[in-house]
Each structure stands twice: as structure tokens, then as C-alpha cells.
From Swiss-Prot:
The gene is eno. Mg(2+) binds at D241, E282, D309. This is Enolase. It comes from Micrococcus luteus (strain ATCC 4698 / DSM 20030 / JCM 1464 / CCM 169 / CCUG 5858 / IAM 1056 / NBRC 3333 / NCIMB 9278 / NCTC 2665 / VKM Ac-2230). GO terms for cellular component: cell surface; extracellular region; phosphopyruvate hydratase complex. Keywords: Cytoplasm, Glycolysis, Lyase, Magnesium, Metal-binding, Secreted. Its EC number is 4.2.1.11.
Length: 425
């Protein structure tokens, strides 16, 4: 079994032009693993700490040279360890850090090493990464939750909801799902142009026009679905990322120009689900509004997927609380929220044991790294959120999923409508 021979890190740029950490791990058999760490725009209060330099003279204080230096310290600890023993590798880094939120070394340093070790070990095993991570039963291709219209923190517009997504639930394969979603994306551009609206792009490749309301965004997408030749609700469903913590303050939500309670937000979402084929709502309420989440889950949880992103931050302790209190029914998985691969697997395992679906997710600040595509298939998650079919940092993940589907051949199963509560029975 190959041992870790050397670890090297560098500062590179992400899709927003901000620095991030890239790590390379070399094994004694010559295998090389490389991984780059993503970064979010709307971040949960309880996420693991991303280490930035704070030197305003470099990249406005967003440099990551300190995190790069931290990797050099990690290297001294890990050289000579078995690359295939991922849990021991990650535990050694957590012990070296010694803080509950990875604040000493930085989650971006630890995660970069964690991912690169796995990539190197997969190469040493002569396996594609998804097979190495998930084993012989990894075969489910995820529904691409394609963010084609942006608002909130991902765009400069007056739309409160951060992401409006399409989900090609009726497609027979991932390849066809990607085609369907891409055709709707192009149709949406035409619809926007015909109405004299902006076709500028947000952080994740979706369009970011200035619209009068959130419903107007949904209606535009519905028009685009029809224009592309698909049936709304049968072929293509809708999904939202509200990112409500961004407009929650002092117990209320500033939404569409009004102050609303959690109960009023729940009534609003119920009306949307009644009128649109929405299969998933992410972060509909604030990360600390546990009572509101319980109320919303009781009211809507059997009809729609209620996804905890800022609520759970891929953290087993917060997820366990959600399970116990019946707050939410699905987990958004972001590897950099928790900061190591094994802790990510622990969160996914806990969710799946309790019938919570998992949606593997990118961040708004991405790179050409395709790790999460393999992770989605390795865990049979059934859903992936990695932006619009535009910009190479987003498309890279979709292209990797095409390769994986081709590798699986007849064993590949596309999750489709079975991934969502709205269509179960």
C-alpha cells in the first residue's frame, strides 16, 4: 500500500477571482492527487473556519498564504502515513489543529489535503475516484439541480430568493437530463432577450435580471421550459435556494419589502408549492430558527424537500438535532463547511440512515476541480447542485458526471423523480 511521500500547496484563483488553496499529494508509488478548495458567498455562521491572511495589500485581505503555510506543517505530520487510511489521515489533521472549528490550521488547508489524499489513493488503486470513495455499489447518477436564475447574494438584483433551479426529473439518463436542462437554460436567455431583460450572469452562471418579484422569476422559467419543448412538472420541476439567513434579523424576515414571521414565510412557501411544481426548498428559514423549521416541516415536509444548508452546515451534531426535532428533511452537503472528507461522509451516512435525502453542492467560488461529481455518485446521493450549464468551473462537474455515466454503462441508474418526496407514492 502506498504511503504519503510529499505534500505541497499553492495559492490559486477561484471562479470569482479570489485566492484559494490547491494541494498536491505525492505517494511513494508515484501516484499524484490534486485538489482545490471552494469558497462560499453566503456562508453559515456555524461553518468551519476558512483561513484568510487579512493583509489588505494582497487581494484585499483574501490571500491564503497562511493556509498554504499550514499545509506545510500538516505535511510533516502526514508523510509516511498510509494514503488509503483516510479516516486516520483526517483525524491526525484534526488533532493537529486542536480546535472545534478548524480555526488554527484553517478548514481550507485541512480539506485541501483531505481531498488530495483521496485522489492520490484512488490513482494508486487504479480506480476512478467515485469507485474508490464509494465501492462497487456506487451507481446512481444525480439529478442536476441547475441554478439558471440568480437573485439574493449571488446577483445584484431586487429578487430576494438566491437561486431558482430546474430539475430534469423526467429524463431517462443523466446525459439526457443535462441536455434538457441546458436547452431550458438557452431558452431562458431567449425569453429574457425578448422581454428586454438583462442576460448578465451571476456567480454560478445563472442569469441575473432585475425583476419585480420572486414569482416573476418562476414565471419566466416556466415560460422557458415550455419554449424549449418540455412539460413543467412532468419533464422539468423547479427548486429554490432561499438563503433566508441573508434577510433575517431580530426575529423576522425582510422579504419582498415586508417584515414577515416564520409562520408567514411558511404560508408563502405553501402557496408557491400549491401553484408551481417545486420539489425542493433550501434554507427557507434562518439557521437559528429551529421552531420555525419545525412548523414548516410539519406543514410542508411530506410534499416538498426542505433542505438544511446553513441550518446543518454538513455537521453531524446540528444534523442530529434536526433529526430529533423534525426540522427539515434533507441535507445539503458542502465539503468545505465541515472541512474534511471523513466528516462529510459521516454527515451523509447519518442523513441517509434517517431517510434524509442528500444534495451534494458546489460553492459560489469554485474551480475546475471535479471532486464533488465523484462524491455524488460515490454516495448515491441522487442530487447535485453545481450551477448553470455555463462557465467552465460549473460545466467541469457536469462533464465528469458524463464520464462516470459512460464508465458505469448499463449499471448506471439516473435518480430522476424518485429523488424527491413529492413523487414518492
Amino acid at each position: 500500500m502506498a504511503l504519503i511521500d510529499a505534500i505541497h500547496a499553492r495559492e490559486i484563483l477561484d471562479s470569482r477571482g479570489n485566492p484559494t488553496v490547491e494541494v498536491e499529494v505525492l505517494l511513494t508509488d508515484g501516484s499524484l492527487g490534486r485538489a482545490a478548495v471552494p469558497s462560499g458567498a453566503s456562508t453559515g455562521e456555524f461553518e468551519a473556519v476558512e483561513r484568510r491572511d487579512g493583509d489588505k495589500k494582497r487581494y484585499g485581505g483574501k490571500g491564503v498564504l497562511d493556509a498554504v503555510a499550514a499545509v506545510e506543517g500538516i505535511a510533516e505530520e502526514l508523510e509516511g502515513e498510509f494514503a488509503a487510511d483516510q479516516r486516520a489521515v483526517d483525524r491526525a489533521m484534526r488533532d493537529l489543529d486542536g480546535t472545534p472549528n478548524k480555526g488554527k490550521l484553517g478548514a481550507n488547508a485541512i480539506l485541501g489535503v483531505s481531498m488530495a489524499v483521496a485522489v492520490a489513493a484512488a490513482q494508486a488503486s487504479d480506480l476512478m475516484l467515485y469507485k474508490y470513495l464509494g465501492g462497487p455499489n456506487s451507481h446512481v447518477l444525480p439529478v442536476p439541480m441547475m441554478n439558471i436564475l440568480n437573485g439574493g447574494a449571488h446577483a445584484d438584483s431586487n429578487v430576494d430568493i438566491q437561486e431558482f433551479m430546474i430539475a430534469p426529473i423526467g429524463a431517462p439518463s443523466f446525459r439526457e437530463a443535462l441536455r434538457w436542462g441546458t436547452e431550458v437554460y438557452h431558452a431562458l436567455k431567449t425569453v429574457l432577450q425578448e422581454k428586454g431583460l438583462s442576460t448578465g450572469l451571476g456567480d454560478e452562471g445563472g442569469f441575473a435580471p432585475s425583476l419585480e418579484s420572486n414569482r416573476a422569476a418562476l414565471d419566466l422559467i416556466a415560460e422557458a421550459v415550455t419554449k424549449a419543448g418540455y412539460r413543467l412538472g412532468e419533464d422539468i420541476a423547479l427548486a429554490l435556494d432561499v438563503a433566508s439567513s441573508e434577510f433575517f434579523d431580530k426575529g423576522s424576515y425582510t422579504f419582498e419589502g415586508q417584515q414577515r414571521s416564520a409562520e408567514e414565510m411558511a404560508a408563502y412557501y405553501t402557496e408557491l408549492v400549491d401553484n408551481y411544481p417545486i420539489v425542493s426548498i433550501e434554507d427557507p428559514l434562518d439557521e437559528d430558527d429551529w421552531e420555525g423549521w419545525q412548523h414548516l416541516t410539519a406543514q410542508l415536509g411530506d410534499r416538498v424537500q426542505l433542505v438544511g444548508d446553513d441550518l446543518f452546515v454538513t455537521n453531524v451534531e446540528r444534523l442530529q438535532r434536526g433529526i430529533d426535532e423534525k426540522a427539515g428533511n434533507a441535507l445539503l452537503v458542502k465539503v468545505n463547511q465541515i472541512g474534511s472528507l471523513t466528516e462529510t461522509f459521516d454527515a451523509i451516512s447519518l442523513a441517509q440512515r434517517h431517510m434524509f435525502h442528500c444534495m451534494i453542492s458546489h460553492r459560489s467560488g469554485e474551480t475546475e476541480d471535479t471532486f464533488i461529481a465523484d462524491l455524488a455518485v460515490a454516495t448515491n446521493a441522487g442530487q447535485i447542485k453545481t450551477g448553470a450549464p455555463a462557465r467552465s468551473d460549473r460545466v467541469a462537474k457536469y462533464n465528469q458526471l458524463l464520464r462516470i455515466e459512460e464508465d458505469l454503462a448499463d449499471a448506471a441508474v439516473y435518480a430522476g423523480r424518485s429523488a424527491f418526496p413529492r413523487f414518492r407514492g
